[in-house]
C-alpha cells in the first residue's frame, strides 16, 4: 500500500515516475548470491530448509549445529558442509543466517568475539531472536565496516534507522491461518507427548520419537554417565 500511495502522490505532482525509479535504482545495487558462501547456524526444521534452498541458488553452504538430530541430518543435501567448529563457518561465510532457540546459553552468542572471527564485510541475518545478538557489538562492527549489513526481524530504538541495518517487523506468523495452525500444532504435540511420550520441537529436552511396541513404555532421562542405567 505504501508503494502504491507513493506512486499516486508522484503522479499527482506531475513527476515522471519512470525517470525517478530508473535514477534511484543505483541506490539498491548489491552483490549476487550465486557462488557466495552462506553459513547457517542451527540446522533444525527452518535452518535445514534455508540451507537446501541456498544450495539450489548456487551458493556454497556451511552449517553448524552441535545438537543436529538424525531427522534434520537426513533432510540436508549431501553437498552441504556440516562443521563441528563454528569458527570454521565464521571464517568462510560471506553471509551468515542464524536459526536457533533463545536460551541463557545463546543469549548474546553473537558478541564482539564472534563477530571478530567472521570475515570482514560479512552480512548477518537474524530471524531467530533479538537477544541472541549483542546490539552494541553489532553496531560497532557496522560502524567500522567489519559487518557490511545486518538484517534483523527484531527492531528496537537503537537499530531502526541505523546505517546498514535492515529492520523488519516480526510478521512471519501474522496471518489468521498461521495463528490457527500454530494452535493446532501445539495441541497435537502435547497430545502426542501425553499419549505416546514423544517429544517434538522442545527447547529444553531432546527429541523422542518411537513407535509403541507394546501396551506400556518406560523412558529414563539421565546424564550421559557410565553405568548409570546399571545402577537403577
Where in this protein do the model-derived segments appear?
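Aromatic pocket-lining residues of Rossmann-like dinucleotide-binding sites
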Residues: 53-54, 118
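Hydrophobic Val/Ile/Leu positions in short beta-strands of Rossmann-like dinucleotide-binding domains
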Residues: 38-40, 220
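Rossmann-like adenosine-cofactor binding region
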Residues: 35, 66-158, 174
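N-terminal Rossmann-fold NAD(P) dinucleotide-binding loop
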Residues: 47-48
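A conserved regulatory-domain signal marking ACT and ACT-like small-molecule sensing domains
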Residues: 200, 204-232
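Glycine-rich Rossmann-fold phosphate-binding loop(s) that bind the pyrophosphate
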Residues: 36, 43-44
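Rossmann-like dinucleotide-binding domain for NAD(H)/NADP(H)
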Residues: 120-212
Amino acid at each position: 500500500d505504501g508503494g502504491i500511495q507513493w506512486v499516486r502522490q508522484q503522479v499527482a505532482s506531475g513527476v515522471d515516475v519512470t525517470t525517478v525509479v530508473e535514477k534511484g535504482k543505483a541506490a539498491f545495487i548489491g552483490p549476487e548470491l550465486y557462488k557466495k558462501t552462506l553459513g547457517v547456524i542451527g540446522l533444525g526444521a527452518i535452518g535445514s530448509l534455508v540451507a537446501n534452498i541456498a544450495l539450489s541458488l548456487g551458493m556454497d553452504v556451511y552449517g553448524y549445529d552441535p545438537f543436529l538430530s538424525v531427522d534434520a541430518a537426513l533432510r540436508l543435501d549431501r553437498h552441504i558442509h556440516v562443521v563441528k567448529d563454528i569458527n570454521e563457518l565464521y571464517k568462510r561465510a560471506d553471509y551468515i543466517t542464524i536459526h536457533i532457540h533463545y536460551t541463557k546459553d545463546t543469549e548474546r552468542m553473537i558478541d564482539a568475539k564472534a563477530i571478530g572471527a567472521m570475515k570482514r564485510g560479512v552480512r548477518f541475518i537474524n530471524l531467530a531472536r533479538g537477544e541472541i545478538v549483542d546490539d552494541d557489538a553489532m553496531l560497532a562492527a557496522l560502524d567500522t565496516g567489519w559487518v557490511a549489513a545486518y538484517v534483523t526481524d527484531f527492531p528496537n530504538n537503537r537499530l531502526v534507522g541505523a546505517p546498514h541495518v535492515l529492520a523488519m517487523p516480526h510478521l512471519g506468523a501474522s496471518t489468521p491461518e498461521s495463528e490457527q495452525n500454530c494452535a493446532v500444532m501445539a495441541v497435537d504435540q502435547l497430545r502426542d507427548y501425553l499419549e505416546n511420550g514423544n517429544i517434538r520441537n522442545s527447547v529444553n529436552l531432546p527429541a523422542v520419537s518411537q513407535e509403541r511396541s507394546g501396551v506400556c513404555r518406560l523412558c529414563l532421562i539421565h546424564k550421559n554417565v557410565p553405568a548409570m542405567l546399571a545402577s537403577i
